[in-house]
Amino acid sequence: MDSKLNKAFHRLIRIIMFKKGVYCKYGKGCVFKEGFFADEETVVGNYNFFGRFTTITKANIGSYCSIAPFVTIGPGEHDLGSVSTSERLNAYKTHKQSLTDGDVFIGNDVWIGTNVVVLRNVRIGDGAVLAAGSIVTKDVPPYAIVGGVPAKIIRYRSACEKEELIRKTNWWNYAPEKAASLLKSNGLMN
């Protein structure tokens, strides 16, 4: 009986864990496409777009971000210092160790391309761009364009030159109409 109960419990966990859906806290005006998943430990700001089959765990995401399909943010990593990397042995360990701890922090107005992976304990600055297919293992400065495996800085966006003025407007704290008006009145948008 114990074996059947154990199997049923693990099946229920698999159903819950792998069921796609929006379980996170999120702000106004967000768009979540088919197959999107974000766990309860994720917090999402306003007016973000999330592409199909994107998976997010343990992340804090600002506002006005554009996240393409098939992006993975915050996947856990196995303990490489352990005798075995198998999670199947965790039930028998005296001191259970979870997959990598730490959250991902993504600023405002960040663009993340298709098939990007952002590992835990990484901070992505405002206005950054992560090129398609990149694996981001380290922090990304504001307005940097990064790409590759592992991701490296390619260059900075032209908005970087106006970063101080952009930050003063705090445009990402407003609804689209007010945000556009602020940017236009400060000469930051045509």
Question: Can you describe what each PLM-predicted range is?
Answer:
Residues A179-N190:
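ABC ATPase nucleotide-binding domains
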Residues D139-Y143:
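Gly/Pro- and small hydrophobic-enriched strand-loop and loop-to-helix capping segments
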